[in-house]
Amino acid sequence: MRTTTKKQIERTDPTLPNVHHLVVGATGSGKSAFIRDQVDFKGARVLAWDVDEDYRLPRVRSIKQFEKLVKKSGFGAIRCALTVEPTEENFERFCQLVFAISHAGAPMVVIVEELADVARIGKASPHWGQLSRKGRKYGVQLYVATQSPQEIDKTIVRQCNFKFCGALNSASAWRSMADNLDLSTREIKQLENIPKKQVQYWLKDGTRPTEKKTLTFK
């Protein structure tokens, strides 16, 4: 009697779509609200680098504790937010551990809050660079937030297919995002936010024209 063996799913799949998001804006511009609107936080695999505790996920407060959790979960379910000192060393270890459990057959959302605190300008640091360049085909879906787009690495800017731009408050930030969104700095500034009611933002999807959108709060 012939028996069949279930085909093992490869760890990488180069055909997976690029859904990486770069989420840029000053404090109160709607970055976290946009991410909450996009991400299923009840999903099986959601991780966050979350220094300011913006997201409702099980909280981990040391790299050692995070490492134990990662080793226990492997390619299985894992949901947590890591809140530690925002140093490049800690962030690199976070990225290294996240990449180790990334798998095309088990998609995983990875949120990075305030990248400018831990990123290098220009080329990405080694493990962050690996996660941002290779993560897509390993099933990683990145949501990378920052208030200072001019202070982050160019690697992640190139890798993100979706670019969100909320209100900004510096000329260098306006210029940086104008270049990335194919808009003028004047257009970048034309966003109307109403406290507790709405935020407006620009969103670019790949090569499509940048669109102005509104997120309302109930």
UniProtKB/Swiss-Prot annotation:
Keyword annotations from UniProtKB, A to Z: Capsid inner membrane protein, Membrane, Virion
Any one Gene Ontology cellular component term annotated for this protein: membrane
Subcellular location: Virion membrane
Tagged with keyword Ribosomal protein: no
InterPro entries: P-loop_NTPase, T4SS_component
Chief location category: virion
PANTHER family tied to this protein: SLR6007 PROTEIN, UNCHARACTERIZED PROTEIN YJGR-RELATED
Protein name according to UniProt: Protein P9
Organism: Pseudoalteromonas phage PM2 (Bacteriophage PM2)
